[in-house]
């Protein structure tokens, strides 16, 4: 079975296909010029332990946004008309329905990155992306862009797994973009919606035994494990699940049987959506797993990677899917399906 993990997908998009030369016909009307008084200074990181600061004297007007978290979070803040290029979304059908109209107005949209020359011609004043975006082999470093009067913001959760990934990182991401775009109230509203969703679930299930939850991704004949230090695991912990974890990055079939999870969340990337049912069937038909509670009670659910890896606004989807999967009595409508 082919596994398109986030790393492989990044390599496919960013290296295998390579940045491409593009011509952008910008038919957007010029967004309003908004001065920021006082100026806003935001800290971001090139890598763990290597911070850099960006100062904004006005709301950015020509934004190049890489990956779904950047594009959709900026749209959710009400500033989609400031995006001149949105890269990294395979198909508009993966965009939240309420964001598609704004997404459609972005002048340049593609799964592939435009090359450096093309991005320079877009004259951006802000670039938002992941750590992998801003290297000498890709779209250059933050220093390169700051020398050209353009700021860079890198999602902290894309820096790597040297430390735990948490919901608080995503709240900071949304809050930082809210400050950059002078949309602080909107950012807090989005964050509060997520926090209230968690608080409601926790309050309503306070007297229940924590369900044992397993977060996995299929890797050939093995399972990659998403434990406490991953965002998926952090969501589970925050919702008072008993999250299965080990000292290794994978979990064997034998260990799954021994742990006997009540619910399994099957993580799939957008590159795997067309094979999602095949992947699910692979798990459901494993002879050794037939006695596991999650399979016996039909509690194996898809969890899209976009909701648990540097998700930004899509963290709400991750919270909803996990809470519905953990507590079916509280949410009898079933687990949201973002894949089909």
Task: Annotate the PLM regions.
Residues 164-179, 188, 266-340:
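Structured C-terminal subdomain patch of bacterial secreted/periplasmic proteins
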Residues 64-122, 126, 130-132, 244:
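A short, structured surface patch at a secondary-structure boundary
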Residues 5-14:
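Bacterial N-terminal signal peptides
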Residues 54, 60-61, 128-132, 157-164, ...:
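Second-shell loop/turn segments in exported
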